[in-house]
Amino acid sequence: MKEILNRLINHDILTKEDAKQVLVKIAKGEYNTSQIAAFLTVYMMRSITIEELEGFRNALLELCLAIDLSEYNPIDLCGTGGDGKDTFNISTLASFVTAGAGVKVTKHGNYGVSSPCGSSNVMEFLGIKFSNESAFLKKSIDQAGICVLHAPLFHPAMKNVAPIRKELAVKTFFNMLGPMVNPAFPKNQIVGVFNLELARMYGYLYQNTDKNFTVLHALDGYDEISLTGATKTISNNTEGILHPKDFGVKGIEQSQIAGGETIEESARIFIEILKGKGTEAQNNVVCANAGIAIATVNGVSPKEGFESAKESLLSGKGLKALNKLQALSA
């Protein structure tokens, strides 16, 4: 690690293979916490390269406990986090709405690091069982249309990093990696990212795979469609800009999509929205993100996807998916 750190401090970059090997050695426990923290800090001070990101991704995918759910042709809706916006759990809510619309979802998530309440914090509070057992996950996706893949159960190699990330409490390159390392290897993916540079990297890396994808970055900084302005999109064959009017709705203010300050408050907001008791702004932002997921899988327009999502939310199908998952978890 000393040699790697010296190279990085001298503004060198790692090859794809070097990057992969560093992560493999971290996973094996070959480095101490100070060395790992120093390594992570380098990437807070300079941009990661595509080669480095690809190497880190390859290491995590090679080391993960893979689960085959390909028969369901699922999608994952996952943001990098780290946008500093502290919204409510939009992509997790959108995942249940997407499932309610009949599109199968393998939701990859984790506890919050740079936000007070990540996807897994809310799921755990609501009684969702975290499991890496194939039978349970298949039963979940069969009966609820969605299964939750809690990252630490599938990436045991990262147990050496989790406490350091928690102590640092700022975004690291692991935020960038999260959506790329879903252990179900879903063929469909919605990824929200915290800056345009990362959107380009994701687009480049995904174009070299067989994934059907849409990368999202709200131009005012959100790692999802926020409806507070325009959103950059990169998909398999196109790039574009989405505006609120493309979903048939008006723009909203940042304050209208603020999240809870505690897990309890976040869970309350989550349930209120799924019950159809959310504000118009909350409902629309959830349905815009779910709508893009539905559009990505079914090959329809964002507006058509949005309408399907709205029907799922307001008819209670999204809530039904959550309730089913809760029952299976009991």
Name each model feature, range by range.
Residues 7, 59-65, 87, 102, ...:
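Glycine-rich anion-binding loops and their surrounding alpha/beta cores
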Residues 1-87, 101, 105, 252-257, ...:
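Acidic, glycine/proline-rich low-complexity segments that act as flexible tails and inter-domain linkers
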Residues 79, 83-140:
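A generic, well-ordered mixed alpha/beta core segment in the N-terminal half of proteins
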Residues 1-2, 14-17, 32-35, 113-117, ...:
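Short acidic alpha-helix initiation/capping motifs at coil-to-helix transition points
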Residues 17, 92, 117, 121, ...:
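A generic alpha-helix surface/boundary motif
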Residues 38, 93-97, 285, 289-292:
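Short amphipathic alpha-helical face segments that pack within enzyme cores
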